[in-house]
Amino acid sequence: MTIAGSDTLAGGGLQSDLKTFEDYHLFGLTAITCIAVVKNGQFAITNLPTELLNDQLNTIKDNLSLDGIKLGLIHQLESLEIVKSFLRSFDGPIVLDPVMAFKETDHVYNDSYREKLIELFPFATVITPNLKEAELLSQQKISNPTEMEQAAKKIIDLGAQSVVIKGGQRLSGNLASDLFYNSETFQYFSKPKLSNVTINGAGCTFASAIAANLVLGKDLVNAIEDSKEYVYQGIKNGLLLKNGEGNVWFGDSVKSEVMT
């Protein structure tokens, strides 16, 4: 299942999670935390009442068995506490995408949110911050692989079992490299950088693909490797929007290239 926000443009959020689960032939469930829209040209988030989030989680817990959980945007401190309580009764794979910064806006979350989010780390099999989020969590700048490794160590020290820092386009060079660290081993996953603007939802899709792969029995390293390729194909085959941006999308291409 995914516990995440709803993206009205369906590039990221629970919409991309469900599409990813479907590509991996898994039945996806949702608990919605908030709704993201574009209002007067500005990115805006409306929270759902925390009681409603709790009701959604209880509905799932009382009626279904879960094989894996992906955590996305959990916008309120009270919601983080509700989710933490829910995770205590689950012992399967959990992938946490620690959403703290957005491409669409300069908004970032405050220290109180950071501290509450960190309380979820021990429950997660792996967390998947982008560079900005890794900087916020580790409280250091990241401008090269050495600093990325330093940040990964600090994130593990916060209680994470393992972390994948998504390098994206920001670091120099021709490769988009993600760094995996589990307190023992560093491993890079790299693909050639793409110039495509169809990147909305890449982070959400990456995390939900890892969750899907773990549910299907892959070990964590192979799950990350497969998910990296899956997202790469989604960016290559993405859907352009009227505003000049675009969503990750796969069509029929990804199933033949990745799902074999």
Feature names for model-found ranges:
Residues 1-2, 16-103, 253-257:
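Conserved N-terminal subdomain of the carbohydrate kinase-like
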Residues 15, 136, 196-220:
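Short, small-residue alpha-helix embedded
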Residues 110-185:
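Conserved phosphate/ATP/ADP-binding segment of small-molecule kinases
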Residues 25-29, 187, 213-227:
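Phosphate-handling active-site elements
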Residues 1-15, 208:
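N-terminal beta1-alpha1 ligand-phosphate binding loop
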